[in-house]
């Protein structure tokens, strides 16, 4: 019997990258999973009897509520965990080159959607007097020298929301934590972005930091989606009771600089 046997989990971004790895491992460990993504998941998930899926854009107003309603309909009234993994990157734009579209997209997907999903699951978790929320932030949540202003602001905001939710509901056995990945192999956070449009001047100011971190990869030190997934599932499980309001880097010490 897996360590997540009969857990009911909502996992966003479940069609690829960290979200796919998290959903796959959770199912292997006995969880029941409601996956969410703007793209269709692979057949390996669709064919699993304990996996249900909502295809939708989390930035649209009805989607967070529709996701939670679908989970309740599929698995009953209990929701043990919410894993906010879905995210989008920016074009590394500084505040002086930032477009309204990029700002609104990053804030909508990376901050507003996770907050609205937390708003939808908290009443259920309060009623059952338990629950665990894990948000995927970023190294950019801990630094101003990783990405553009939109992505950086959205992930800093998610860390603030995580801490507030953790403190507010700690007496009701509801936990809320965040992880901050660095560079992760096999992720699709740049999906839909044209890299030729990146703010090259802003990227240049960060080049030394990025080059230092990339040397690890040249030496064969890679962080895989499964590495992040296992940390997320540890935090959502009872094995991490007592860990609440934590912001945990998973970046092979990148966060130390």
Curated annotation (Swiss-Prot):
Source species, domain of life: Eukaryota
Pfam families hit by this protein: adh_short
Subcellular location: Membrane
Enzyme class: oxidoreductase
Biological process, per Gene Ontology: novofumigatonin biosynthetic process
UniProt pathway: Secondary metabolite biosynthesis; terpenoid biosynthesis
Active-site residues from the entry: 151 (proton donor), 155 (lowers pka of active site tyr)
Membrane-spanning segments: 7-26
Membrane topology listed for this record: Single-pass membrane protein
The entry's keywords: Glycoprotein, Membrane, NADP, Oxidoreductase, Transmembrane, Transmembrane helix
Reaction(s) catalysed by this chain's protein: asnovolin H + A = chermesin D + AH2
EC number: 1.1.99.-
Residues involved in NADP(+) binding: 11, 119, 151, 155, 184
Record flagged with keyword Hydrolase: no
Main location: membrane
UniProt GO molecular function: oxidoreductase activity
Residue positions the entry lists as glycosylated: 57, 92, 110
InterPro entries on file: NAD(P)-bd_dom_sf, SDR_fam, SDR_superfamily_enzyme
Phenotype of gene-disrupted mutants: Completely abolishes the production of novofumigatonin as well as asnovolin A.
Described purpose of this protein according to its UniProt entry: Short chain dehydrogenase; part of the gene cluster that mediates the biosynthesis of novofumigatonin, a heavily oxygenated meroterpenoid containing a unique orthoester moiety. The first step of the pathway is the synthesis of 3,5-dimethylorsellinic acid (DMOA) by the polyketide synthase nvfA via condensation of one acetyl-CoA starter unit with 3 malonyl-CoA units and 2 methylations. DMOA is then converted to farnesyl-DMOA by the farnesyltransferase nvfB.
Family that this chain belongs to: Belongs to the short-chain dehydrogenases/reductases (SDR) family.
UniProt-recorded name of the protein: Asnovolin H dehydrogenase nvfC
Organism: Aspergillus novofumigatus (strain IBT 16806)
The encoding gene: nvfC
């Amino acid at each position: 019997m897996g360590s997540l046997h009969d857990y009911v989990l909502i996992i966003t971004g479940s069609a690829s990258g960290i979200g796919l790895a998290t959903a796959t491992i959770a199912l292997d460990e006995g969880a029941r999973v409601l996956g969410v993504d703007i793209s269709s998941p692979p057949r390996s998930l669709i064919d699993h009897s304990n996996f249900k899926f909502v295809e939708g854009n989390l930035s649209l107003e009805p989607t967070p509520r529709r996701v939670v309603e679908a989970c309740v309909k599929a698995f009953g009234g209990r929701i043990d965990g919410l894993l906010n993994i879905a995210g989008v990157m920016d074009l590394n734009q500084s505040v002086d080159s930032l477009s309204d579209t990029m700002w609104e997209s990053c804030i909508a997907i990376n901050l507003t959607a996770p907050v609205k999903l937390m708003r939808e699951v908290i009443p259920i978790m309060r009623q059952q007097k338990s629950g665990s929320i894990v948000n995927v932030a970023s190294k950019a949540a801990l630094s101003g020298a990783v990405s553009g202003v939109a992505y950086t602001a959205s992930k800093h905001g998610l860390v603030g929301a995580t801490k507030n939710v953790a403190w507010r509901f700690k007496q009701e056995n509801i936990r809320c934590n965040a992880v901050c990945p660095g560079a992760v192999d096999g992720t699709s956070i740049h999906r839909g972005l044209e890299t030729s449009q990146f703010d090259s001047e802003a990227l240049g100011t960060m080049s030394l930091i990025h080059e230092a971190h990339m040397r690890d990869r040249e030496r064969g030190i890679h962080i895989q989606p499964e590495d992040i997934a296992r940390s997320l599932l540890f935090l959502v499980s009872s094995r991490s009771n007592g860990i609440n309001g934590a912001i945990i880097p998973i970046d092979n010490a990148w966060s130390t600089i």
